[in-house]
Structure formats: C-alpha cells, structure tokens
Swiss-Prot record:
The UniProt record lists the keyword RNA-binding: yes
InterPro entries reported in the protein's UniProt record: Ribosomal_uS15, Ribosomal_uS15_bac-type, uS15_NS1_RNA-bd_sf
GO biological process, one term: translation
Bilayer-spanning residue ranges: none
Keywords: Ribonucleoprotein, Ribosomal protein, RNA-binding, rRNA-binding
Molecular function terms, GO-annotated: rRNA binding; structural constituent of ribosome
GO cellular component, one term: cytosolic small ribosomal subunit
Keyword rRNA-binding on entry: yes
Protein name: Small ribosomal subunit protein uS15
Assembly and interaction partners: Part of the 30S ribosomal subunit. Forms a bridge to the 50S subunit in the 70S ribosome, contacting the 23S rRNA.
Function as written in the Swiss-Prot or TrEMBL entry: One of the primary rRNA binding proteins, it binds directly to 16S rRNA where it helps nucleate assembly of the platform of the 30S subunit by binding and bridging several RNA helices of the 16S rRNA.
C-alpha cells in the first residue's frame, strides 16, 4: 500500500528541483497524491476500513495545507503542480 523506493525516486526525479530535493512542496504534494491514489483503490475493496480512512483524511488535509502554502508563496508553481497532477481545485 505504501510507495516503493523506485516509485519515490521516480517522483523525486519528475517533480524535484534537484537530485536530493525531498522537501519542496511540489515533491511532497506529488508523493501524497500518489499515496492517496493507492489508498482509494484500497477503499474500493475494503469499504469498512474506517481506521485507514482516518489516515486518508489526514493525508488529504496535509496535501491541502501544502497546496495553500504554495498558492500563497508562488502562484505560478501552484498552478503548474495542480495541472500536472490533475488535482481538482
């Protein structure tokens, strides 16, 4: 259910600003988005898994806060990441 090292490295390469960039908002949002997509597949099969659903809601909230921060600091980067990931806003 969690991302493999290879998947994380691929996301870092695609969205990171440098080789070891793991802290930029774009990378964090991309990682959370990938995790959320995998969790949504999990919930299609396990509808009554309320314990994990709480974790999903925390991740959605974290992504929302990161996107709000990015929008406040640099709206161009915000628009670019929302379009690249296909996030509804």
């Amino acid at each position: 259910m969690s991302l493999t090292v290879e998947q994380k490295a691929e996301i870092l390469k695609e969205f990171g600003q440098g080789e070891n960039d793991t802290g930029s908002p774009e990378v964090q949002v991309a990682l959370l988005t990938k995790n959320l997509a995998e969790l949504q597949d999990h919930f299609k099969e396990h509808k009554k898994d309320h314990h994990s659903r709480r974790g999903l809601l925390r991740m959605v909230s974290r992504r929302r806060k990161l996107l709000d921060y990015l929008k406040r600091k640099d709206e161009k980067r915000y628009v670019a990441i929302v379009e690249r990931l296909g996030i509804r806003r």
